[in-house]
Curated annotation (Swiss-Prot):
Gene Ontology molecular function terms on file: ATP binding; homoserine kinase activity
EC number(s) per entry: 2.7.1.39
Residues the record lists as binding ATP: P82, L83, T84, R85, G86, L87, G88, S89, S90, A91, S92
PANTHER family linked to this entry: HOMOSERINE KINASE, HOMOSERINE/4-DIPHOSPHOCYTIDYL-2-C-METHYL-D-ERYTHRITOL KINASE
Species the sequence originates in: Bacillus cereus (strain B4264)
Subcellular location: Cytoplasm
Known pathway: Amino-acid biosynthesis; L-threonine biosynthesis; L-threonine from L-aspartate: step 4/5
Name this polypeptide is given: Homoserine kinase
Location, primary (coarse class): cytoplasm
Catalytic activity: L-homoserine + ATP = O-phospho-L-homoserine + ADP + H(+)
HAMAP family reported in the protein's UniProt record: Homoser_kinase (MF_00384)
Function: Catalyzes the ATP-dependent phosphorylation of L-homoserine to L-homoserine phosphate.
BP GO terms, sorted: threonine biosynthetic process
GO CC term (a single one): cytoplasm
Amino acid sequence: MIPFSVRVPASTANVGPGFDSVGIALSLYLDVVVKEKADKWQVIHSFEESIPADDKNLIVSTACKVCPSISPHIIEVTSNIPLTRGLGSSASAIVAGIELANQLGNLNLTADQKVQIATNFEGHPDNVAASILGGTVIGALDGKDVSVVRIESKELGVVSLIPNEELNTDESRSVLPKMFPFHEAVKASAISNVLVAALCQKRWEVVGEMMERDHFHEPYRLELVPLLPSIRKCAKEFGAYGTALSGAGPSIFILAPYEKRQEIAGQLARVFTDMKVCELEIDHKGIIVNKEEHIGS
């Protein structure tokens, strides 16, 4: 087999009230170069030592669950997606593993099938669907049924503020209530409905307003990310549409006019000097497989 590579974009989830449903692919990437067969799986990477370099690696273990018959290979993994920062690092690894199985096992999976499999692993479709399809996605998992709609948002730019501290998703979910009053659920879902409608109609000011009015999760996570209100205030003053937690946090996700993203990022970097401020774009391609002969040569 000709060596091939897989590129998977990062993602942000929720966009405020679109909890476990709305996702956006971002221009940070996990790259996997698949090299020669081997007696056992070898994962070449320069991440921290806690990231496995064998068949326990999330990419490899996912691939082997999808297609147990695939032969071990040497793979090289690089990524500029920060780990445990709310930017879909684990989702991108799961998606890469599914594509690894798809290619090595000649499964010929459709995009919809990849989304279904990835959602089964992840438990919700927002991050994985965005990484597979690119762009902005709205998804729902109902039992075993996954439904996803993709929309374009090319007029939008993204700024992300990434703190030095990690925040495990399980820890961030632990602060959420186990029960939600009916009247609060009605209010929260109505706001989410307007967010989705505004995304579809490209009414960006309304998108920004709705993404800052979440009731599902952000009020409970403020204790873990206390800078969110001040970042939100500054971003709005600098011309952003809206600000929200990126996934479970701790990163902050800002939607802005595409042409203003650099200026807004620069202004925020001067205020929040203890955080890494990234000017990003929405990735519209999703997962990419490259089978050109020069890969790995």
